[in-house]
Structure formats: structure tokens, C-alpha cells
């Protein structure tokens, strides 16, 4: 049944795309002999993912001398969440950026990247672990088995909890109705703090906050500003518990259809984008926080000492237990790999200081 629904979604999308671009063929030439590549992502215009996609578009069109056009589709234009993954898997879109929660619906082990306090507080350490570590190489294999090829793993910033009351300890979160992505692991993790985690579609989060249907939500700073969540919240709680990870993927069938020159071009561009998105998300986090404070000076920021954060880390173990119960030996192997990758990256980065 799921496969039938996915195929219906793909056919519908192909018709929509055909209406927009004049072609239903993945790399068909237009009347001007221009190939069209389709790029779908999960965020709104102006977001980190959108900036990544638009920079990719700019570089592809520049380096191909205009022989390739990249059409970018932000969240909701073709599909949301799991639907976007199916479009990529069936080659209805050629590139996509996915988050760990949606991919976890077909690759449970991918929830590794959502475990609380698994990553370093140092973004450079995390970047090195994601780019050079063994855990993402193993995840690459699992993605490929599901008809997705990861080209880049990147950070979009730490998740920040917003609320209408200060959160100093896990006890302060008792009964806290927090919007989370539809992930069983996230539900288990936030439940361990005493929360009432509630999955709500991203584009409906503001109205749910405004109508007091939920008490708070969790997202990177840029998203909190971009979606105006701060307008209906009073506190930003910087727990540094979770890094939001984006995965830039392509479709295997599409990839094999490319010439060697096109493959080389894409790989060179993704290397350039790795530095671009790292610098950009750091800049976005700072600029968007400043914008929030300028627009709402009354909002309060709560930061934590290592001792205060330790109380949350202790509770976070429930998320690890859930993950390992779900994924077994494969999950344990991946967790060990990621922890080793981060430790090695930490050592290497600190040596360079």
C-alpha cells in the first residue's frame, strides 16, 4: 500500500514538474539544449537548506556554462517530509536535502544523528567527524541500499528550545507540551525530560503556539527567527543538546546517467559548499539571534553551565536506550563509530589550536 501511495505521489509530482519546466525527463534537454536538474529541500525560502540549494544552482549553472539548469523546490512545493524522500528515491527529483527524522522512517539507524548530547559543543569537531568519520560512511551504505547517495553531511546549528517559562532543570519540563518532528526517538528523548512531545507539521507550528495548542518547540535559531516562533514565545533555552543535521543526496539512477565531467563538477561543487554552508550557518545563527533580540528585546536567553547540562544528559540516556533497542547490534556499532569519530576529531582540532 505504501509503495502504491508513493508511486501516486511520484506520478502527480512528475505531472506538476512537467507543467513547470516543460519536461518530465530527468536530464532531458529543453528547446535550447539545456539539461534540467531538480533539487528539493525541506525548508522555506531563505533558510540554510535553501541557501545551500541556491548556491548549488548558481555554481552548476556557472560551471556548465549554462548548459545545465537547476530548478529548486522549497518545502511544500512538491512534497513535505517523507514524500520528498520518495520523490528522490523514485528519481522524480535528482537532488534533495533530508533531515534524520524523515530518513529514519526507512533507515531507523539514521536516528543516531538525533541522539541528545552525542555531538561536541565545537562545530568544527562535528564537521570533521561528519566529513571524515566512519559512522557517516556506514550510513552512506545504508542510504545507498534505499536508493539515495549522500554527497554531503552538514550542520544547521544547535537546536534551541523555546518556551513561555524558564527551563533550568529537567523538572521544569514536566508536562511541557513541546512540538517535535514525528520521530519515535525524539518522543522518547523528550518524554524522559518529563515533556509531552507532540509532533506538529513544521508549517503549522506557529499557529499551534499562538493558539496554545502546544507550549513550545525546538529548532535552530535561524528557523525560530525565520518562522517568527519567537513572537509567541518568551524564552530561548540553549541546552546544546542536539545538532540539526542536513544530508545532501542524489538518486543512484540519475547519478549513473551523468557524464564523468558532470560527476566531477558536482563533487567539486559539494566540496565548495561544505565550507560555504559551515560559514553560512554560523553567520545565520548569530545574525538571526541579533534580529530576534532587536525585534523582541523582552525575550530572555537561558544558557547552562556544564553542571546544569549534566542533569539533562543523564535523562537523555533514555533516548539511547530506545535507539539501541530499535536498531540492535547495527545501532550499537554506529554509535560506537560516531563516538570514536568525535573523540578523534576533538583531539585533532585541539592539536591545531
Language-model segment annotations:
Residues 15-19:
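C-terminal motif of bacterial Sec signal peptides marking the signal peptidase cleavage site
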Residues 127-138:
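Signature of the catalytic double-stranded beta-helix
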Residues 1-4:
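Positively charged n-region of N-terminal signal peptides that target proteins for export
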Residues 11-12:
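Repetitive helical segments and hydrophobic/amphipathic motifs
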Amino acid at each position: 500500500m505504501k509503495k502504491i501511495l508513493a508511486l501516486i505521489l511520484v506520478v502527480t509530482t512528475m505531472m506538476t514538474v512537467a507543467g513547470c519546466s516543460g519536461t518530465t525527463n530527468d536530464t532531458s534537454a529543453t528547446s535550447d539544449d539545456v539539461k534540467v536538474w531538480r533539487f528539493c529541500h525541506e525548508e522555506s525560502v531563505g533558510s540554510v537548506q535553501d541557501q545551500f540549494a541556491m548556491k548549488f544552482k548558481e555554481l552548476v549553472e556557472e560551471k556548465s556554462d549554462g548548459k545545465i539548469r537547476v530548478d529548486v523546490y522549497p518545502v511544500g512545493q512538491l512534497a513535505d517530509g517523507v514524500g520528498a524522500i520518495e520523490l528522490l528515491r523514485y528519481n522524480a527529483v535528482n537532488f534533495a536535502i533530508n533531515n534524520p527524522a524523515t530518513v529514519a522512517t526507512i533507515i531507523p539507524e539514521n536516528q543516531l544523528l538525533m541522539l541528545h548530547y552525542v555531538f561536541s559543543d565545537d562545530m568544527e569537531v562535528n564537521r570533521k567527524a561528519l566529513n571524515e568519520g566512519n559512522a557517516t560512511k556506514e550510513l552512506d551504505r545504508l542510504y545507498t541500499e534505499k536508493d539515495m547517495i549522500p554527497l554531503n553531511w552538514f550542520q544547521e546549528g544547535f537546536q534551541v528550545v523555546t518556551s513561555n517559562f524558564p527551563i533550568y532543570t529537567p523538572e521544569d519540563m514536566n508536562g511541557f507540551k513541546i512540538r517535535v518532528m514525528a520521530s519515535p526517538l525524539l518522543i522518547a528523548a523528550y518524554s524522559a525530560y518529563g515533556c509531552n512531545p507532540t509532533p506538529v507539521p513544521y508549517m503549522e507550528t506557529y499557529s499551534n503556539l499562538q493558539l496554545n495548542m502546544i507550549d513550545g518547540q525546538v529548532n535552530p535559531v535561524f528557523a525560530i527567527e525565520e518562522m517568527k516562533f519567537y513572537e509567541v514565545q518568551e524564552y530561548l533555552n540553549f541546552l546544546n543538546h542536539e545538532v540539526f543535521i542536513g544530508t545532501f543526496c542524489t538518486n543512484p539512477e540519475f547519478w549513473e546517467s551523468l557524464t564523468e565531467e558532470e560527476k566531477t563538477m558536482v563533487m567539486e561543487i559539494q566540496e565548495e559548499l561544505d565550507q560555504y554552508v559551515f560559514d553560512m550557518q554560523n553567520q545565520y545563527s548569530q545574525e538571526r539571534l541579533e534580529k530576534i533580540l532587536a525585534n523582541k528585546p523582552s525575550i530572555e536567553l537561558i544558557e547552562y553551565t556544564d553542571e546544569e547540562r549534566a542533569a539533562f544528559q543523564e535523562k537523555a540516556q533514555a533516548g539511547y536506550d530506545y535507539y539501541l533497542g530499535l536498531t540492535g547490534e547495527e545501532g550499537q556499532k554506529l554509535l560506537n563509530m560516531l563516538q570514536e569519530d568525535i573523540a578523534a576529531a576533538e583531539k585533532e582540532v585541539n592539536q591545531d589550536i
